[in-house]
Amino acid sequence: MSNWLVDKLIPSIMRSEVKKSSVPEGLWHKCPACEAVLYRPELEKTLDVCPKCNHHMRIGARQRIDIFLDAEGRAELGAELEPVDRLKFRDGKKYKDRLVGAQKQTGEKDALISMSGTLMGMPIVVSAFEFSFMGGSMGAVVGERFVRAANHALENRCPMICFSASGGARMQEALISLMQMAKTSAVLARLREEGIPFISVLTDPVYGGVSASLAMLGDVIVGEPKALIGFAGPRVIEQTVREKLPEGFQRSEFLLEHGAIDLIISRGELRPRLARLLAQMTGQETPEQAREAAAVA
């Protein structure tokens, strides 16, 4: 019996353990909406949109920019800027410790990435919020990176697009963070005066000081399907007004129906549809027209 254990059973158990450990971690992902178990490589092909229920999962700022801009000719704006704990703020944890933790978790210095590049050949500037960095909250660095992106658009007379995903102003920066609402709104007013298009794309979620400033100041405001958009959360509103809110309240579909946003576009359609829209707004050829002209020539 002892020989059987040594020769047969133990090697069998060891082989089983090796097989289990050889399966890469994160190969499968459960959809938070329909709970379907999805194969990660297949999910990446659909841009993190569930093929079963069309739920648009949250994605990082760099991933969003990677799938939106053309691959060539990109340049990051304001990458050298880093947050500073000027107020020595502390709640349950020191602000500087929260920053270090968020930077380690995301690999980013702060919650906004701005980049110049092209969209189907058209020069453009893009900003995208990183929600995983302290809830995409807006502080001094976020505001300054946004302003630098807008100034680049002004100097080069090219359109700007911002993908918002934020819980609002960063409370750890107090009045400094609130000032960013005015700062970003002011530079967008300059874009409008110069006739340079600004498109705001609202992704899940957009709340607080970001929704009350730059996110709602687009010449065209686009929402991703079923994105949560508002100032205060629905639970807070219900507790305040002591009434049951309508079904789907603060979802992008509800806002479209009531005229608060202009369009809802699925993630996979953002590139071609926004390219056509910007071509029309700037008087350029659409990508389709450019291809047709090249084919005729």
UniProtKB/Swiss-Prot annotation:
On cofactor binding, the record's note says: Binds 1 zinc ion per subunit.
Q: What class of enzyme is it?
A: transferase
One Gene Ontology BP term is: malonyl-CoA biosynthetic process
What keywords does the record list, in alphabetical order? ATP-binding, Cytoplasm, Fatty acid biosynthesis, Fatty acid metabolism, Lipid biosynthesis, Lipid metabolism, Metal-binding, Nucleotide-binding, Transferase, Zinc, Zinc-finger
Its GO CC terms are: acetate CoA-transferase complex
What's the chief localization of this chain?
Answer: cytoplasm
Quote the record's binding site residues for Zn(2+): C31, C34, C50, C53
* InterPro entries documented for this protein: AcCoA_carboxyl_beta (IPR034733), Acetyl_CoA_COase_Trfase_b_su (IPR000438), ClpP/crotonase-like_dom_sf (IPR029045), COA_CT_N (IPR011762), Znf-ACC (IPR041010)
Q: Which cysteines are joined by disulfide bonds?
A: none
Asked if Cell membrane is a keyword of the record, the answer is: no
In short, the EC number is 2.1.3.15
CC cofactor: Zn(2+)
The protein's name in its UniProt record = Acetyl-coenzyme A carboxylase carboxyl transferase subunit beta
